[in-house]
Amino acid sequence: HRHTAKQLLAAAGIPVARGAKFTKWPDAKAAFEHSFAHKSIVVKPEARSQGEAVEQFSIPPTEKQFDRAFHEANRHHGVLIEMMARGTTYHFTIIGQQVLSVLETAAANVVGDGRKAIKELIALKNGHRATSRQLQLDASARRQLKAQALTPETVLQRGQQVFLTTAAHPQTGGDLYDVTDEIDDSYKQLALKAAATLDLPVAAVDIVIDNLYAPYDPEADGQAN
């Protein structure tokens, strides 16, 4: 589970996002009122969920938004609430002591052409994708559109980009860009250390990185999480 993995990584000196695990709403609500109410946070299931029920609030959430995100994430083994790290999520695929690929991830989105409605753009993009990476026009996506004063029927201006999710994950329709040859090698070493710490010969490691070209500095706060 994520919380146990974070404890092991932190003990090994690997940077992890600050946060806590909650299983009961009264405890989470109290923590929200005292700690999280005015901060950018991430709410996600404690068990890995392939990007499902993960909500990122770059703008601090209202109590109503936090309530909904907590209960959507709290379906199995509790909820992790973390401080939101600055930067972009990079997905490292590791086998043995080798990084096979590094993919930059972007949240599910569509780009307008001045003619098609958002729902048509989603269908068009899904037509070129594997079933496992389809964009979803679900309740969460509709909330994201509503927050941007948009509906599935809205026709976007040419070049206008609209995001359907807050979290970047390929399983929820996110975009992927291969940066294996571009990213500084220090982050590959960090990912390998994380996999070794968790004793995983085959691993997928996600790291939020502020600048993929700047070498990793353990003393620099917030450079990688």
Predicted regions and their residues:
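Conserved N-proximal alpha/beta basic substrate-recognition cap immediately N-terminal to
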Residues: 1-30, 34, 49
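Short glycine-biased active-site loop of nucleotidyltransferases that positions the nucleotide triphosphate
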Residues: 32-33, 93, 215-220
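Acidic/histidine-enriched active-site and ligand-binding environments that engage anionic O-linkages
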Residues: 32-43
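Glycine-rich phosphate-binding loop of ATP-grasp-fold ATP-dependent ligases
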Residues: 41-68, 89
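Conserved hydrophobic "DFG−1" position in protein kinase catalytic cores
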Residues: 56, 94, 207-209
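Phosphate-binding site of ATP-dependent enzymes
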Residues: 60-169
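ATP-dependent carboxylate activation and anion-phosphoryl transfer catalytic cores
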Residues: 98, 106-113, 166-225
